[in-house]
Amino acid sequence: MRLLYIARKNLLAKPLQTALSTILLAFGVGMVSLMMLSEKQIKDQFERNIKDIDLVLGAKGSPLQLILANVYHIDAPTGNIDYQAAKDVVNNPRTHIESGIPLAYGDNYMSYRIVGTEYSYPEHYGAILKEGELWTNTYDVVVGAEVAEKTGLEIGSTFYSSHGLTDTTDVHRDKTFTVVGIFDRTSSVIDNLLLTGIESVWGVHEGHENADKEITAMLLKKRTPMAVLTLPNYLKDTNMQVALPSIEINRLNQQFGLGADALRAIALLIMTLSFASIFISVFENMHARRYELALMRTMGGSPGKLYKLLLLEGGLLSAAGVLIGLLISRLGLFVLASAVENKFKYDLSDMGLLTVEIKLALAATFVGLLAAALPAFKALRMDISKTLSNE
């Protein structure tokens, strides 16, 4: 305890140098930790939403946009497709498709998408009703847990939809939706949607040419792997295409991976500089206090005790930097989560400590101790008489 007190006092005696070493390490650890937290949550949500969706059938355009719009609901759709033509794709034995889930949308309520679909869609994500029942009549709506929480909708609430996916000004006041059910939280895309029958979406847009025959996309489950090979050829003379979620998301990860790797490299560089700063801090402290250390030796302090003292100073610097870094990462995640929720309606607010973060903290503390151990080792070989005579 006495050594800990002395080590703390020694660090506080040089606040600028101590603060610099701590801040450098904190920012390095904070950046790496923030990337670990955000990547883990984004990956988990992407994998959860893509579960058992082998292919997505939709209008021709960008395959990635087709996936983002209809699986994750974070982009605009590529267009509409004929509902009967989509059902023919599912029912044709040549396509090797086992089943399909239709999605039709184009309206929103308070920027949350209203999606016309079948019961198989919430069943696919294991959605369970918290209150009420599933839709049975046109304009019945079942809302996701996040939608209910953010908008205040409850059983029996009525509202008008707005045209578009984010605009809330072009309101369809001739058709009234009624909330008949609320889903329990699923930690999937269902939480951020309002689900209704396809007929409700068609009814809102009645009068639009072919509105009652079109959907936005069909989520497909293949019967055999041959579907991946046969479908593109089957659709070549139509206005439809299929996209593979796994391939498109891997491509997206590769594109963002370059930026993530660059940020990770910068964070590691900052951490390296912090370890160098710890080395310099302990070395300069030892050099500036060589007379004090020599006196401690003459008063009975063993070389091992001096070594432990200097090592403890490096350990305190490292531990402080790691702890502050973890706090910085949580603050950064809070800001990032707010931005992501406002923009994409996705929740990244899990602040729990990851196993990989514990490993990062231990590794950073160990390297910090190692950086302090090198100059501290020099204290073991101090020439006491020479040091005192020079002073």
Regions found by a protein language model. Give the residues of each.
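Peri-membrane helix termini and adjoining interfacial loops of integral membrane proteins
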Residues: M1, M240, L293, L331-Y346
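Internal alpha-helical transmembrane segments of multipass membrane proteins
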Residues: I23, D261-S281
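Hydrophobic, regular-secondary-structure patches
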Residues: M36-R113, E123, N137, Y234
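Mechanotransmission and gating elements of multispan inner-membrane complexes involved in transport
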Residues: N92, V171-T178, I182-A260
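Hydrophobic secondary-structure segments that place a key small or acidic residue at a functional site
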Residues: N108-Y119, A127-G207
